[in-house]
Amino acid sequence: MLKVKRLEEISSCHSSNPLEKVAFFQCMEEVEKVKCFLEENSGDLDLQSGDNEAEENVWSNRALDERIIVKGGRTSALTDDIPAPAAPFDHRMVMAKHASVDNLYTVSKSEILGGGRFGQVHKCEEKATGLKLAAKIIKTRGAKDKEDVKNEISVMNQLDHVNLIQLYDAFESKHDIILVMDVEGGELFDRIIDENCNLTELDTILFMKQICEGIRYMHQMYILHLDLKPENILCVNRDAKQIKIIDFGLARRYKPREKLKVNFGTPEFLAPEVVNYDFVSFSTDMWSVGVITYMLLSGLSPFLGDNDAETLTNILACRWDLEDEEFQDISEEAKEFISKLLIKEKSWRISASEALKHPWLSDHKLHSRLSAQKNCNSGVLNLTTK
């Protein structure tokens, strides 16, 4: 059985920065033997990859025909299933201004909301309106960096959904580009590693429904996120169950006839086709959805090794299980949901639309049972603490 680390350990010993090309291929050299073995055993499936790419697109066209592209419609009536609030401004088309952000906004350099490979996110306020926002300051070292950020702006201009962070303004200077966006509470990752935050299966259902709704919308717009992970899921506030997906810096426009390959991402969440430098598609995001589900339910990382090379080896082998004690009280529906996503052959994974129809996310009787179980456990906890 694959040895996994708790997320508390991950946060202290494992970097979540995306792989640089050199580091990526250095890791790949170490797992080449495993890769070759796996390719020999899956050759028949790989021959079908071209057809599978076309087949994966059928459901998206059908969804468009049915006119179900929604800005934030809900798919269930759970007690806590309240839609995430819309951004405090109308969706707008943004172009980077060649001007100073300080002309229109007060950026608080001391109030840092988060950070990553790109730089830092600071609290900011629009001077004319007092609107509270967030300023993502992205350092750009050359033309390629600027092109990447402008791609992120282009992607965000196309996305208008309550579960996706919204872009308000942008500014370009010689050494950076600043994106002014809607501001939210904190990372879902913070909740996972918080010992005082007891995520239940029902909580996880609420989170995953919203993630799938946001991803379904992106896929209907033919956009792949390609960097889904708990750090890129923001909770609206500390206590609410509403979330928004952020960071579209690695997102790509998906054109089925133009085979897309990528060699970036966060090791733990990479799909096998990314590790293999094979074609990616909608189902590449769905693999990451499976990993996130596994983490939220158990606090464990399904493929994490002692180093990046071992992690990639585990992913290529699709080596995971549900045998840890953390899954003892998890429903069979949840386990089946994960098993529909963590599949090496990408064409076999369920789509975001299909995920939302899966019993784990759509069965009201199951949700009622889990709610009763949650209330029962809360009652027992209250008695023991008195």
UniProtKB/Swiss-Prot annotation:
EC identifiers of the protein: 2.7.11.1
Catalytic activity: L-seryl-[protein] + ATP = O-phospho-L-seryl-[protein] + ADP + H(+); L-threonyl-[protein] + ATP = O-phospho-L-threonyl-[protein] + ADP + H(+)
Residues holding ATP: 113-121, 136
Keywords: ATP-binding, Kinase, Nucleotide-binding, Phosphoprotein, Serine/threonine-protein kinase, Transferase
EC category: transferase
Domain of life: Eukaryota
Protein name, as recorded: Myosin light chain kinase family member 4
Similarity comment: Belongs to the protein kinase superfamily. CAMK Ser/Thr protein kinase family.
Active-site residues, record numbering mapped to chain: 227 (proton acceptor)
One Pfam match: Pkinase
Signal sequence segment: none
Native source organism of the sequence: Mus musculus (Mouse)
InterPro entries xrefs: Kinase-like_dom_sf, Prot_kinase_dom, Protein_kinase_ATP_BS, Ser/Thr_kinase_AS
Residue positions, PTM Phosphoserine: 100
Residue span(s) of domain Protein kinase: 107-361
GO MF term list: ATP binding; protein serine kinase activity; protein serine/threonine kinase activity
